[in-house]
């Protein structure tokens, strides 16, 4: 019985930590508005488009998509935020005496990217239509950085107007024209990191379409707009930002549900075991209970007598289970987010739940013991 209670505590503690992890991840503010965004992927290069033709296609497609009823704004980028992918690049800061090579996340973004994703502008400006396309021989291309980039590499200095070079495999040079708010980049779990945004060119792209209605309802209109320009261009990975985030939490949700199921099952078995044990004890000690009542014990005294046994067993199992949980939950550390393996709130909640269930399991045997007739009990063999 003690082992059953201990295992229930162990299972419920793990389940509690995993459920709290899931809730913490779902409540994260990723730094942009994830609601009402339709995502779809295009790769014109598969149909023989070069970079220049891709840019022309995108410039024609954007106003067509914005003309769809219910569409608020449209943009595109090399990859979507929270895609699970990791894109980084190296660069140097012009004017640094040591000419240090730095590293940052980077994302090529199209017109109205920050407005569509609702990433707040903190200083300077975001990309303008004049930034698409820039002349190939333009010495300094515009760049927008996030707040963490400015904080990491420029400290308390003004980042606007600063120049960086050697960006990407082409070693391009950029002038910082704006600073925007921090966003989660790869996943909800990923830490905020320095991020560099540059104007997107042609080639493969993810389109982000913000709507005032259910994003799924405009999919036929989006397909029609694309096919009107080129009916041989396929759309890939049609999705909504919300659904994409929900799917990214599939593992956490599955583990939380399974652990909750097994935790609840172990608690139920412990409850049944405690009830069965106390029922057996009441039957076995019926004569003793009758003697106690004949000697003046009140029903409330009998109630306390039986409940005390159940609580003692539960407490012993709970203490053993708590020590086991403290030792075992540290192996869950890699699965947790926003909660420590030894989180006191979780352990207190589990102990409270066990106490309530234990009292409920003690109730029926205790009630039966209170109703024992002393005269019948004294003749009980």
Predicted regions and their residues:
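Hydrophobic alpha-helical transmembrane segments of multi-pass inner-membrane transport and secretion
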Residues: 1-21, 253-287, 315-316, 356-360
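Alpha-helical transmembrane segments
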Residues: 7-36, 279, 331-341, 366, ...
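Intracellular coupling helices
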Residues: 272-313, 371-379
């Amino acid at each position: 019985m003690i082992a059953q209670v201990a295992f229930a505590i162990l299972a419920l503690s793990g389940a509690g930590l995993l459920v709290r992890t899931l809730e913490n991840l779902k409540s994260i503010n990723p730094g942009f508005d994830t609601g009402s965004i339709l995502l779809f992927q295009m790769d014109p290069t598969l149909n023989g488009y070069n970079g220049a033709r891709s840019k022309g296609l995108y410039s024609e497609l954007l106003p067509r998509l914005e003309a769809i009823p219910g569409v608020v704004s449209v943009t595109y980028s090399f990859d979507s935020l929270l895609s699970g992918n990791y894109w980084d690049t190296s660069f140097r800061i012009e004017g640094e005496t040591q000419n240090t090579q730095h590293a940052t996340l980077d994302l090529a973004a199209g017109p109205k990217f920050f407005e569509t994703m609702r990433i707040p502008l903190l200083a300077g400006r975001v990309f303008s239509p004049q930034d698409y396309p820039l002349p190939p021989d333009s010495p300094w291309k515009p760049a927008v950085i996030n707040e963490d980039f400015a904080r990491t590499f420029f400290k308390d200095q003004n980042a606007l107007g600063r120049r960086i070079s050697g960006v990407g495999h082409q070693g391009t040079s950029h002038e910082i024209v704006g600073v925007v708010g921090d966003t989660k980049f790869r996943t909800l779990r990923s830490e905020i990191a320095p991020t560099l945004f540059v104007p997107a060119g042609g080639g493969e792209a993810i389109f982000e379409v913000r709507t005032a209605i259910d994003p799924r309802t405009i999919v036929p209109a989006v397909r029609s707009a694309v096919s009107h320009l080129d009916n041989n261009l396929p759309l890939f990975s049609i999705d909504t930002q919300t659904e994409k985030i929900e799917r990214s939490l599939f593992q956490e949700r599955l583990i939380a549900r399974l652990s909750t199921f097994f935790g609840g099952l172990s608690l139920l078995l412990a409850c049944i075991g405690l009830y069965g044990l106390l029922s057996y004890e009441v039957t076995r000690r019926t004569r003793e209970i009758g003697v106690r009542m004949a000697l003046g014990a009140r029903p409330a005294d009998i109630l306390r007598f039986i409940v005390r046994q159940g609580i003692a067993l539960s407490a012993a199992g709970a203490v053993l289970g708590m020590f086991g949980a403290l030792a075992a939950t540290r192996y869950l550390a890699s699965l947790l987010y926003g909660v420590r393996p030894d989180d006191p709130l979780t352990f207190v909640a589990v102990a409270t739940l066990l106490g309530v269930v234990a009292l409920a399991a003690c109730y029926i045997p205790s009630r039966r013991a209170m109703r024992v007739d002393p005269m019948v009990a004294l003749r009980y063999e």
